[in-house]
Regions:
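Active-site histidine-anchored catalytic micro-motif
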Residues: 2
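Hydrophobic helix-and-loop "lid/oligomerization" segment in the mid-to-C-terminal part
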Residues: 8-130, 135-169
Length: 169
């Protein structure tokens, strides 16, 4: 059940099917403690909530709906984040009106920048593949060599969003 909830985003993501819901229903009927699982999955440590505050105060968004934030290694350290725990910040910008694509830029130990890219519509994995990355159509990752290189990734995502909007109309 935990995997189903996490992978389907609490049944919000496109990968949720009748089979997904059926499996969850079966597990519920087997007596799982759904409330305890949800509490363990979604309760946030204070440092993560504080880091989310940083994200919400620092992110920028373009006219086409590409949002991003940059988090240096020093800032990550100030919030006690690790490579593993910083993933809790990836969906901070997920449900903000007008944002189609969002990118979380995290400086790694080696100075390269990890870009976690997510989408509410446009296909992003092809862009990620051009930046030493890849992934799923709406959830991908990439690597840029330095902070100055982030703009090239953002520019490509901006184009993807413009194309997406044209195709919708």
């Amino acid at each position: 059940y935990t995997g189903i909830i996490a992978d389907s985003g609490r049944f919000l993501y496109d990968n949720t099917t009748t089979a997904t819901l059926g499996a969850a229903s079966f597990l519920y009927d087997c007596g799982i403690d759904r409330n305890k699982i949800h509490e363990l999955l979604y309760r946030r440590p204070l440092n993560i909530v504080q880091a989310q505050g940083f994200v919400l105060s620092q992110f920028e968004v373009s006219e086409a709906g590409v949002a991003y934030f940059k988090m240096s290694k020093d800032v990550q350290d100030s919030y006690g984040l690790t490579t593993g725990t910083r993933s809790a910040l990836v969906n901070t910008l997920a449900n903000i009106e007008g944002i189609r694509v969002w990118v979380c830029f995290f400086e790694n130990e080696d100075g390269r920048i990890r870009a976690n890219i997510r989408s509410n519509g446009p296909i992003i994995n092809e862009v990620a593949a051009r930046f030493e990355g890849g992934g799923h159509p709406k959830a991908s990752g990439a690597i840029v060599k330095a902070w100055d290189d982030c703009q090239a990734l953002l520019d490509e995502l901006e184009q993807v969003c413009h194309t997406y909007v044209k195709e919708l109309n």
